[in-house]
Every structure is written in C-alpha cells, then in structure tokens.
Design a protein with these regions (language model features):
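Macromolecular interaction modules
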Residues: 1-274
Length: 274
C-alpha cells in the first residue's frame, strides 16, 4: 500500500470490515412508528454503534411494493416466511476485532433489556453474524465496501444462496467471479456486490429474544447488492443473475429481498409496510 491511496484499488486500503451483523426485524402491527423511533433513536446506537470496533451501521426498509418483489416464495432465510421482515439493519465490524466486538455486544444486549430498553413488540426474522469474504465492483474507481453504509445507497438487495454439491462460500465466490458476477455487474444498477459467509456458532447464541431464521449450513453465503437507484430497478438483473448462478451449477437462491433507505429522523414508510 502506498499513499496517497490509489484510485480503484480498495482491496489495498488499510481499513476493512471483517465481519457483519445483519438483523431483519418485523414490528408488530400497530407499533410501526414506536418501533422505528425506538430503534433509530436508541437501539441503533445503544445496541451497536457505541461499541468499540463497530465501524459503521445503516438501516433500510421494505415497503409493501418491495416485499412483493421478493423471490423465491419458499425459503429458510426468513422466519416465518419470505414475506416477513420490514426493517433491516447492517453493521460493519473492523477486521481482526470480531471477538472483542462480540463480547461487548453480547453483554450489552442483556444490559439493555434488564434496564428496560428493549422493545418486545417486534419479531426477529433473520439476525445473524457473517464473515466478510470480498467485494466486487461495477466501476473502475468504486466506492469501497468499507464506505458502503456511510454512502447512504438508496437501495440494498440481500441475496442468500446455498452452494451446490456442498461447496464452501469461498469456493462458490471464486466460481461466481469467473463469469456470473462480472456479467451481472456490467451495465447494471448494482455498484457493489459484497459477499459474506455466515458465522456458524458451536452452540446457539444466548439472546433475550428469538433471533428468527438460523444462519444456514456451511455452504450458505449472503450477498449484499448496493445501488443508488430505486432497488426495484435492479430486480431484473438479479433475477437473471440468480438463474445464471443455478444454471452454472454454482448455487441455488434461497431468498432475494430488496430494501430502500430509511429517511433518518422521520417516520416515512411506517404506513406502507403492509
């Protein structure tokens, strides 16, 4: 690495996310505004952003029209079903410091709940931890993945895949990079495709609430697609991508779910979830 940092070479930059917390949640009907305000004005910070080595965090929302675009309908990546989960929050953890972050956050969530700062009128749909594998980019001089959450992309589409023939996530990514990923990114609205492998705990994580769908098996991987356009505009390209990935014998899609950016400090979209 040399200074100044060279354009178009984010892999050489000194700061990287090493792991991620992804939490997809459904507020109970009638509590949409209350949940949004509690999460944005308390839990987003108290539960994660205050923690050491928590690099960045951001939230998106799935309105009814975006939920209607999810596919396929049969999935184990959302509990109880593909249609569940309106708000998603994502946090980057600094590379090399996952264990310290996890020790802090695990204790923190119990402290918050015991202190009356929980929110029982919500259900977790998919809350899991992931290890960062790598990011692929559409542009020659891209926004590096480390900045993706601070960039406030208008859309984020989450895709959960299962590698075929028991392929591990890193092996699946290597195959995707040979053809499917470059073809999808070229000329599409997607600027960044970040690939993650679930962290499979030896024992179930302790939590004061049910965390929804599990992390999947050892061949599961998750891709976050970032776009600065309406996320709906990316769906045709991502449908073609999912079909190409399966046809190539690389992986099968468990769920593709698009989200739009929340408008911080407002209750916008809370009346459009159902």
């Amino acid at each position: 690495m040399t200074y100044p940092l060279e354009p178009g070479k984010p892999a050489d930059y000194p700061v990287h996310p090493g792991s991620m917390l992804l939490t997809l949640v459904e507020p109970h009907k009638g509590y949409e505004v209350a949940f949004n305000r509690w999460y944005e004005r308390d839990h987003f910070y108290g539960g994660c952003m205050e923690g050491e080595f928590n690099m960045a965090g951001a939230r998106w929302v799935a309105t009814r029209d975006l939920k209607d675009l999810r596919f396929p309908k049969e999935t184990d990546a959302a509990k109880p079903n593909y249609d569940s989960g309106s708000f998603i929050a994502v946090y980057w953890v600094l590379a090399g410091h996952h264990d310290e972050w996890l020790a802090w956050s695990g204790k923190r969530v119990f402290d918050l709940y015991s202190g009356g700062r929980g929110f029982p009128e919500r259900s977790h749909v998919n809350t899991n931890l992931y290890t960062f594998l790598d990011a692929d980019y559409r542009d020659e001089d891209p926004v590096p993945v480390m900045l993706a959450l601070d960039r406030h992309y208008q859309g984020m589409i989450v895709m959960w895949f299962d590698g075929m023939d028991g392929a591990k996530p890193a092996d699946s990514l290597k195959k995707l990079r040979e053809k499917c990923l470059p073809e999808m990114l070229a000329g599409s609205p997607v600027e960044i495709a970040a690939t993650w492998a679930p962290i499979l705990p030896d024992e179930p994580r302790e939590s004061p609430m049910d965390l929804g769908a599990g992390p999947g098996g050892p061949n599961r991987f998750c891709q976050l697609m970032f776009t600065d356009e309406d996320p709906e505009e990316s769906i045709p390209a991502l449908k073609a991508y999912a079909e190409a990935v399966e046809k190539a014998g690389i992986a099968t899609l468990s769920l593709c779910a698009p989200f739009k950016k929340t408008i911080v400090g407002t209750d916008t979209y809370t009346d459009q979830l159902w």
